[in-house]
Amino acid sequence: MVKKKYALLIVLLCSAAFSMAQEKRGMIGFGISAGATNYEGELDGNFTLQYTRLGFGVHTTALFFPRLHVRLAYLHGRIGAHDGGLFSTNNRRNLDFFSDIDELSLVFMYKFQNRKRGFTKRNFVTPYLFAGVAGFMFDPKTTYNGQTYELQKVGTEGQYLDGSYPKPYKLQQVSIPFGIGFMVKVTQNFDFGGECGFRKTFTDYLDDVSTNYPDRDQLRAQQGEIAVELSDRSNDPAAHGKVRGNPRNMDWYVYTNLHLTYYITTSLFKSYKLKNQFKDNSCKHLMTPKKL
């Protein structure tokens, strides 16, 4: 139910934003991005470069005003880390994970440029800020003795046990994306740029590590021996109840990328309502309907 509510909210926001943009401003862009993804959590507290993975995305951008744009984007990336890393402070715990991230985001972009310039006469280099809302899916996994396991299904912190253990966490979550970027005008229709965007999540389980070690005997009885092995890789027989993670600190992930965007006018959609977007008539030729 919660997942459906978030999906409906994003759909409604997208519909309203892009309908307004096409009706009033008449400029829309389509683009691609590629770059690096990383994470911060129990297994890596500093977005360590060692754990950087590749990510890519597609996006569409609608122009409200010269300084305000709205962007709908899809991102696919991967995050991961392990306790045996170069800067790890918890080698004894000996845990590791990796997870794909699939994200759909809606953000507002504020560009630092001259409001009186038309689109084709926009600044050569334009910095911007952005913030919005996103829904994403993840699924932490690990490889043990040559086999890959989905950790959420294992219940490494006793999620499927009887008693006062945490409930199984959802693999669909919401995040708050925000960051900074820049755009470089390549041609009248093309922009090339770079961006660094952080995602604040509301889950501490991107890495499947959050609370305490469960009772080994109870975990073995209800989930099997493999659950015990994946829960406690330190082989500490007295681990029950000891701290495994920190539930007070939610996990983060970041996407740093280069992107390319191609802009078209809504004259392609037989709409010529561009006067507010292009106050200096720099795109007047784009607003004139072709003669039959």
Segments (PLM) and residue ranges:
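Internal transmembrane alpha-helix with an interfacial aromatic "cap," most often the third helix
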Residues: 103-116
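Transmembrane beta-barrel domains of outer membrane proteins
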Residues: 59-61, 109-111, 181-183, 261-263
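Bacterial Sec-dependent N-terminal signal peptides
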Residues: 1-26
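Membrane-embedded beta-strands of outer-membrane beta-barrel proteins
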Residues: 58, 106, 129, 178-180, ...
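Interfacial segments of alpha-helical transmembrane regions
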Residues: 123-127
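Primarily recognizes Gram-negative and organellar outer-membrane beta-barrels
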Residues: 22-55, 63-102, 120-122, 135-175, ...
